[in-house]
From Swiss-Prot:
Its EC number is 3.1.-.-. This is Glycerophosphodiester phosphodiesterase domain-containing protein 4. It is a multi-pass membrane protein. It is found in: Membrane. The keyword Disulfide bond does not apply. Residues 198-457 form the GP-PDE domain. Keywords: Glycoprotein, Hydrolase, Membrane, Metal-binding, Transmembrane, Transmembrane helix. Residues 39, 91-109, 184-468 are extracellular. CDD domains: GDPD_GDE6. One of its GO terms (cellular component) is membrane. Glycans are attached at N308, N397.
């Protein structure tokens, strides 16, 4: 929001830099610095948010480094401070946001719908996953009442998660679909209702093409088709009206080189003889002192011409205006206390104007001081008022007003246009703002950027109501189709996962049934000569059997004498080869997951070369 607000107030950048110059004494593009900082912080926060979203999407645990935590806290603190400053001291900046929404709202609507379609992808995925989880839990629900109630509570919670995720999204989307019903934009109208292009007054001439309030600047404005010239007038100590905006000579003259101790004094306390010797153009060609960041580079001829500029008088401007038949409007600054013209400055300026022989209707008289005297001695002047009530303007016989462009919000000064009052707004430097004034049927604007605005032959962002309705319905229909397609895609994919789960569960249940089928044990187990049964045949063979193991029961208390029933082996005539027992295990696992492995153990005794020794095999039957 802060970035958007600062971008839209670009017409105020010069005033902001000028105010900081008055406070610091150093000219710097603080407005551009704040804009760049806001863009960097916005990009950083957006990338961090996007990274966090992607990590959550991949189900990776989030870990925010300490540096990121500090930067996020600084961003939040800076936003809070700037928001406080704007709400406390610059409340009118919110009017700029309102004006920008009047012209950008149709495009914001279309972009917002596109963004909502993109955001619907994770929303649909999450809702579909929750639905699949609910169905899977229902499928696995046991018949036990206690577990059943517990499962039902889990399902209810899962259902409840779908509401806060899907419902706000649908409400916002519905609001966007109905948003055009509440949009008011002056640039949405029929072509035949579009008013003429506003005429342009050069603000201090053409300050982007030449040093402000110099003859070069005014001549550049005339070359670019200015309808009128705007300036600021001070009176020297010896009664000469001259053109100067600031209340000192530090920024726009070389007084720091000529008389540095007087750089911060009011120019009204200097005589014209001294003021006429000051250079008023060298500062303009210095890159670090250029007044506008987006100025075009000057040619070498213009640079040389700017270096030779001096402070002009009001008479010089009137001569140019009379020659080119241009209107003149100016702010007249009252001299400070102890000035000889403190109370008669208006009459002095009027006498200079009348002496110039300029046609009186070319003068737009803006000062409110001593207006009755001006009417009496110069009845041909066109008197300009401020933004006061229509009744007050009619009482003072004023049919022209000069207002700040922010006053166009909210209704574009409809009442004044209905009263047939000529409206001039200042200071309009951006094409979108000029287009808004054009669509609002404003009569004239005052601008610093005459080079750009004079080239516009059609307002930007203009569209007819039929075209906008077509774009509105087309965007809504396309978005609905995309949303339905995305939802069906996720729903179908989760349904396939659910079916796959059910199939695997059914197969598992079938295999689990095999756990109850008894496995036939092997009929015969060959015992080796080292087993107890072979060595002690008198031992009882009955015992409690465990699956997969052979357990021999303990002998009774009364044991029979054990006879050695094994015939001792006698070596043969030939060399006896040592026995090499080989144990072969054939392991057959049950097909079920829970079955205990059953194995058939088969022990084979290798043949011994002896004199016909015999070892009877012992069969151990299963009970």
């Amino acid at each position: 929001m802060l970035l958007f607000l600062w971008i839209e107030t670009s017409s105020e950048y010069f005033n902001f830099d000028w105010v900081t110059f008055l406070g610091t004494g150093y000219w710097f593009f603080w407005s551009i610095f704040i804009l760049s900082l806001a863009r960097i912080l916005t990009a950083y926060s957006s990338l961090l948010l996007l990274l966090g979203f992607l990590l959550l999407w991949e189900r990776i645990e989030l870990y925010l480094h300490l540096c990121h935590k500090i930067l996020i806290l600084l961003v939040i603190l800076l936003c809070v401070i700037l928001m406080f400053i704007i709400c406390k001291f610059w409340k009118e900046r919110w009017l700029v946001a309102g004006l920008s929404m009047q012209i950008f709202a149709p495009y914001v609507h279309l972009v917002s719908i596109t963004v909502m379609v993109i955001l619907f992808w994770p929303v649909a995925f999450y809702v579909a996953c929750l639905e699949r989880e609910v169905r899977m839990r229902r499928y696995r629900m046991t018949h036990s009442e206690k577990k059943r109630l517990k499962q039902c509570n889990v399902i209810t919670r899962l259902r409840g998660l779908q509401v806060p995720v899907g419902l706000p999204f649908l409400l916002i989307l519905l609001g966007l679909y109905l948003m055009p019903l509440g949009i008011y934009s002056p640039c949405i109208q029929e072509k035949e209702n579009l008013g003429p292009k506003p005429t342009i007054f050069g603000h201090r001439g053409a300050p982007m093409l030449g040093p402000e309030n110099t003859m070069m600047s005014f001549e550049k404005a005339v070359e670019h088709g200015a309808h009128g010239l705007e300036t600021d007038i001070h009176l020297s100590y010896d009664h000469v009206p001259f053109l100067m905006h600031d209340f000192d000579l530090k920024r726009t003259t070389n007084i720091g080189e000529v008389q540095p101790e007087s750089a911060c004094e009011n120019p009204a306390f200097f005589n014209w003889d001294f003021l006429s010797t000051l250079n008023a153009g060298k500062w303009f060609v210095k890159p670090e002192l250029r007044p506008f960041y987006n100025m075009k580079p000057l040619s070498e001829a213009d640079k040389e011409r700017a270096r030779n500029q001096s402070i002009p008088t009001l008479a010089d401007l009137l001569t140019l205006a009379e020659k080119e038949r241009k209107f003149v409007i100016f702010d007249l600054h009252r001299p400070p206390p102890k000035h000889p013209l403190r109370h008669t400055f208006v009459r002095q300026v009027v006498s200079v104007i009348l002496a110039s022989k300029i046609e009186q209707h070319l003068i737009f008289w803006l000062p409110a001081h001593d207006r009755q005297y001006v009417r009496s001695v110069a009845p041909g002047f066109q008197h300009v008022g401020r933004l006061v009530s229509i009744e007050t303007l009619a009482k003072n016989n004023i049919s022209i007003i000069n207002v700040d462009y922010k006053k166009l919000f909210p209704n574009g000064l409809r009442d004044y246009k209905a009263a047939n009052i000529h409206i001039n707004v200042y200071t309009v430097n951006e094409p979108w703002l000029f287009s808004l004034a054009w669509c609002s049927r404003i009569n004239s604007v005052t601008t610093d950027n005459i080079g750009l605005l004079s080239q516009l032959d059609h307002p930007h962002f203009f569209m007819t109501p039929k075209f906008y309705v077509f774009m509105w319905l087309l965007a809504d229909i396309i978005s609905v189709l995309f949303i339905v397609a995305i939802f069906c895609f996720h729903w179908r994919r989760e349904t396939e996962k659910e079916k796959l789960f059910e199939t695997s569960s059914t197969r598992t249940d079938t295999q689990s049934g095999n756990l109850h089928i008894a496995m036939k044990p092997p009929v015969r187990v060959v015992e080796g000569p080292w087993t107890l049964a072979a060595l002690y045949p008198a031992l009882p063979k009955s015992g409690k059997e465990h699956q997969g193991h052979f357990n021999f029961a303990a002998p009774s208390k009364k044991l029979l004498p054990i006879k050695n029933a094994v015939t001792p082996l006698k070596p043969g005539k030939h060399e006896i080869q040592p026995p090499m027992p080989t144990v072969v295990f054939e392991l057959t696992q049950a097909p079920t997951r829970q079955a205990t492995s059953e194995a058939t153990f088969q022990t084979t005794l290798p043949t011994l070369k002896v004199d016909k020794p015999t070892m009877p095999s012992i069969e151990v039957p299963y009970p």
